Amino acid sequence: MLRLSLLRSTATLPVKCQRRGLILPAAAMYTLGSLIFGKEARLADAMERGELHNKNVDYAKEAEERTELRIRALANTRPMEPRYNGHVPLHRYEKLLLFAISGWNSFFHPEDGYNIVQLGEATALPVFLENLKQTMLSDSSGRRILKEQPNITTEILHMDKLAKLPHNTFGYVYYQWLKRENVSPDTRAPVKFIDDPMHAYISKRYRQCHDFYHAITNMPIIIEGEITIKALEGANLGVPMAILGGILAPLRLKKVQRKRLYNIYLPWAVRTGLSCKPLINVYWEEMLEKDVTALRKELKITLPPDLRTMRKERAALRKEIDAKYNSQKRATTPA
């Protein structure tokens, strides 16, 4: 009996050892998992209750102070303190870099308005802006604009009212032009790199009035239209960037576009710019209910040939010529 019992015990020993070998690692894994995941669960609960943070510390205030320190550190690298909201003072070498980079980008990517804006500020020399200020000070409307410093926005212009004006008014013409070109007066970028606050406002006013020049001359915002209006601004106001644009921008156009500009639109822009009233002195917001034809006559602005119509006529002519060519080609090609 004793021998039989020993044999049975010996036979079952490997099975028990095997079970123990499985149970011990499983228990170890369970214990380790409980420690890890239990700790994470307790950590999450503590975070939710706010027990992890020092309740005596104002974290929002600390973040604000860190931001203020970074701003001060950056301000210490500037040549002067900001002189108006959004002003970014630049060193001379930074202004030269801005001119070089924005000029390069404007030439190769004129469709990007941000490049044009930067080039405009880089070339807006104080002597030019001071001359423009004197032009405004010499005129009663210009003086009022400088004193009141109006800001042109859709809210100020009341676009819903412009849509209901008589069709012969400048306001309705302007409203229709905005709709046709799918633009808004609210999209004008703020001035940042001009140091003198008054000069900055004059630059802002010039920028915001740009669409009025387009509307009163019925000029679209395609590249040819933009070059034409820039040439008008250059002749009328002496804007350096506008003069550069009128000279250099046509070089990248197609031959037919350059021909249109050189033969029709640039001569018109220069003549009109030199003969019409300084457009920077026009209080456009007060002209919206005026008859557009009378306003053009008052400002001595004559309309150029419709650029949209000329482009459509040329496209139709080219389509007709292509159709005739293809028809003749098919007729002469053997079956």
Swiss-Prot record:
Pfam families: Coq4
InterPro entries in the record: Coq4, Coq4_euk
Binding of Zn(2+), residues: H210, D211, H214, E226
Pathway: Cofactor biosynthesis; ubiquinone biosynthesis
Known catalytic reactions: 4-hydroxy-3-methoxy-5-(all-trans-hexaprenyl)benzoate + H(+) = 2-methoxy-6-(all-trans-hexaprenyl)phenol + CO2
Entry keyword Amino-acid biosynthesis: no
Domain of life, per lineage: Eukaryota
Main location: mitochondrion
Compartmental location: Mitochondrion inner membrane
Transmembrane regions listed in the UniProt entry: none
Keyword match Protein transport: no
Enzyme Commission number, as recorded: 4.1.1.130
Gene Ontology cellular component terms for the protein in this record: extrinsic component of mitochondrial inner membrane
Alphabetic keyword roster: Lyase, Membrane, Metal-binding, Mitochondrion, Mitochondrion inner membrane, Transit peptide, Ubiquinone biosynthesis, Zinc
Bilayer topology: Peripheral membrane protein
Transit peptide: 1-10
Similarity annotation: Belongs to the COQ4 family.
Description of how the protein assembles with itself and partners: Component of a multi-subunit COQ enzyme complex, composed of at least COQ3, COQ4, COQ5, COQ6, COQ7 and COQ9. Interacts with COQ3.
Role: Lyase that catalyzes the C1-decarboxylation of 4-hydroxy-3-methoxy-5-(all-trans-hexaprenyl)benzoic acid into 2-methoxy-6-(all-trans-hexaprenyl)phenol during ubiquinone biosynthesis.
This protein's name: Ubiquinone biosynthesis protein COQ4, mitochondrial
Organism expressing this protein natively: Saccharomyces cerevisiae (strain RM11-1a) (Baker's yeast)
Lineage of producing organism: Eukaryota, Fungi, Dikarya, Ascomycota, Saccharomycotina
